[in-house]
Amino acid sequence: MASLQQSRIQSYLEKNKIGPLFEEMMTKLITETPDHPIPFLIGHLQTKQESPGRIQRTLSGSAALWAEGSSEYKGTRRDSRGYEKPWQIHPKKPKKSKSDLAVSNISPPSPESKSLPRSILRPTWDWRTKPESRGFDELNHILLESKKLGKALENLSRSIAVSDDFDLDPRAYNSVLRPRVVGEWVGREEEDLDPLAAEMFQPPVPRAKTEGWTSKDNSPVGSLKMETKGKGLKQQQQNHKKLLAAMLSQDSFDSMPDSAPSVTEDEMEDEDDAMELLEDLDDLRMEGVTGLLQSGSKFSQGRSSYYTEPQAKVTLNICSRCARLQGDSLTARTEEEPERHVPEQAVPEVPCPLPTVTETLTATEDLQTASQVTGLRHPVWASDVKPIRGTSPQTARRALQLQDSLFSKELENMGKHLAEVEKDLAKLAEQGKLNRSPNSPHRSLLLPPLFHTTNTLPVLGQTSRPQSPSSLSSKTTGLPLHNPKPTSLMTDRTSPSNSSSRAQTPSRPITPNSLMMRSFTAAGHGNKERVYGRSRSRPVTPTGQITRPILTPPGLSTTDLYGGLWSTLTEDEFYQQLQAVRKPWRIPSDAESDCLDPPEQDKCEFYTSDPSHSLKTL
């Protein structure tokens, strides 16, 4: 009995396709998830009732499997039914497990993604329903979308109706004359002369929500509607309107000063344009524009930030200008301080006394030497290290340290040169003592290669190039030279004369380079008198030269040279000349000229004690 009833129910379900129908309804509910499921299912069933026989087109995968299983279970009645079973025409699919079936029930694919391939895979479908089924699926989805839009419009109309329920008073609002701005002007009375005064102390929540329920909305219709509304919908609409009001009034109302004048509604309508005009002031400031005019800010009553911000910019500019002026004064002081201290540091006092020399120069020689060596002296390294304008005191301190290091290097170089000169002079002194004996072999070797007659004397106009400074006296000073080429020694042997007569000395200032132009007089060493003239085109500077000073010209040894000089001078005069040579010389900077004295013409002066044999060649 139970089996017969069960078979009858099964046949009824198969005949009316109840199983696939419920499967499809569950699939629709899961995929669409409507807010109101019962009206959604009613609408879905109405669409099925309008088009009978098409339920098999939108079967889900699980419904198709269930239909196949039920058809196999009831295979005995397959031949007795005459209607078509299209889900059995297609070959069987592999059966799914219960977990796969549950997953397919929970998250099935979209209906259009299943229906279109199934229509393609069934070429034997009825020709009357095949084209209509595809169009019906598309139309069905269009209808569903339209229903969604209709629901959204319905919700919007409800929210508008709620706000309109409080506008039953004809004085409250006129939607034709004024545009509706949610959160700003809804429910505002026209007698309110200062509509923004109350909004300064609280966010601009629509007054229809606060005041309308208590004082304005006393009509029974409005109160009845408000009572029928659910609290959830009212809370949602209120929150939404609060958010809109805060967004709309953030720029124009939050930063308004308390003492703002009353604004008419015409001015408020023009306020948006004024905001548009003043919107790009911040952009202009970011681009570096400083002279912004504040005349246009009177159109915007709610932009108080524009009043204070340019003032802050102006004070910053003034402060930066003052800082620049103070920085200039500080750097000027730092420039003056190194210039004050550099001349004291730059003049080196290098005492170079000979161990055995006790005599000093005469007063005139000392004055001339001092005027040449230290009289015209400038700071040596002032051109190398200059303070940069606008630098910090740390930079000036570094510049002073650099000057000290350069000064110490120059002193080291001078000390090296002076040590070499001292060595050479010590050797010369020993050789001079040996050559003082009359039987010394060096005296006979000196005169033939050194001295020429006046017939072989070169004249400046006849020489192909100016005479280089590597002459006799410049070799004895121990200075490094520019050009080590040998030049002819312009000396002459003069006739015998009175031994007490003095040769004329040139009237040139005494420098370390020109000291040897002074005449060497012989007192008590025979009746011969030799005057050495020196030719030079320009003076010799010790900077930028070769490291090892060339003390003697090629082909001439210092022993021979000073042996000849020692034979004509007394010991005291010889040491006096050496002491004059040992005076410190000037070290010019790289930027200065390498000439200490103005270039003069080469002079060769030859004097004798006899006026008849006097010869002067220019």
Curated annotation (Swiss-Prot):
Superkingdom of the organism of origin: Eukaryota
Protein source organism: Danio rerio (Zebrafish)
Name the UniProt record assigns to this protein: Uncharacterized protein C8orf34 homolog
Biased composition range(s): Polar residues: 485-516, 609-618
Pfam family, one: DUF5586
Database matches in InterPro entries: DUF5586
Database matches in PANTHER family: RIKEN CDNA A830018L16 GENE, SIMILAR TO HYPOTHETICAL PROTEIN
Ranges annotated as biased composition (Low complexity): 463-481
Segments of this protein annotated with the region Disordered: 70-118, 330-352, 456-552, 587-618
Annotated Basic and acidic residues bias: 74-84, 333-343
